[in-house]
Amino acid sequence: MAGQAGSLQGRVAFITGAARGQGRSHAVRLAAEGADIIACDICAPVSASVTYAPASPEDLDETARLVEDQGRKALTRVLDVRDDAALRELVADGMEQFGRLDVVVANAGVLSWGRVWELTDEQWDTVIGVNLTGTWRTLRATVPAMIEAGNGGSIVVVSSSAGLKATPGNGHYSASKHGLTALTNTLAIELGEYGIRVNSIHPYSVETPMIEPEAMMEIFARHPSFVHSFPPMPVQPNGFMTADEVADVVAWLAGDGSGTLTGTQIPVDKGALKY
């Protein structure tokens, strides 16, 4: 499913949560296909309820360096996707610098653990605020620029396998990701007349800091039945897939080779959701 070399030549991509993990892989992969990159990340703790270490401004600088190593330009900004004004300012700055916007990868997201009735308000508000509301704010800021550019384009919403199934132990995360599925499909219809495609991807077990194996194992130890909702991947029974493998799918969706697809949900799961 990898894009063809140079398949995004001359295009511009906007990527959230780009300082490390999947977001960095998406930025570098799209740059390798020829796109200039507008990238942002909060680069700071989101909430005390999110216990894994946050990305840093230096991480975002490294993403920019890796993009530039591909011979492409990078415009980066430290911002919170919950901050509407900051998002709009970055989009405006990107349009001023590059003159167009062709691809949006709404990737920013956070995760915490707990049973539904035991979640704190802070856990709920943080996960829903970043994953669902933050994605909506990203789309609200970028879609007018894509329409104005008049080149059609592709929006890739990074959901999760949790957006297609139940995930005991993080129901708030699952709710946010199911919400992205509805948002994706509605937007696909609304943007059809502008030639802009909208699809969601649903990765499973990707090696990023968000995985936080210790926290996951702790909740499985306390509630052993939950583990049945997290099966092994048939073609990779052990370990996690890499962020670069997910980026291959994003590159394909960003380019013209996936031009027949809009309003689709693509599991990036190596078969795990078939259990």
Swiss-Prot record:
Record has Oxidoreductase as a keyword: yes
Top-rank lineage group of the source organism: Bacteria
Residue positions of the active site: 173
Binding site for substrate: 160
Binding-site residues for NAD(+), renumbered to this chain: 20-22, 41-42, 80-81, 107, 177, 206-208
GO molecular function: oxidoreductase activity
Entries under SUPFAM superfamilies matching the protein: NAD(P)-binding Rossmann-fold domains (SSF51735)
Main EC class the enzyme belongs to: oxidoreductase
Keywords carried by this UniProt record: NAD, Oxidoreductase
Entry EC number(s): 1.-.-.-
Record-linked PANTHER family: DEHYDROGENASES, SHORT CHAIN, ESTRADIOL 17-BETA-DEHYDROGENASE 8-RELATED
Family stated for the protein in its record: Belongs to the short-chain dehydrogenases/reductases (SDR) family.
Record's protein name: Uncharacterized NAD-dependent oxidoreductase MAP_4146
Organism: Mycolicibacterium paratuberculosis (strain ATCC BAA-968 / K-10) (Mycobacterium paratuberculosis)
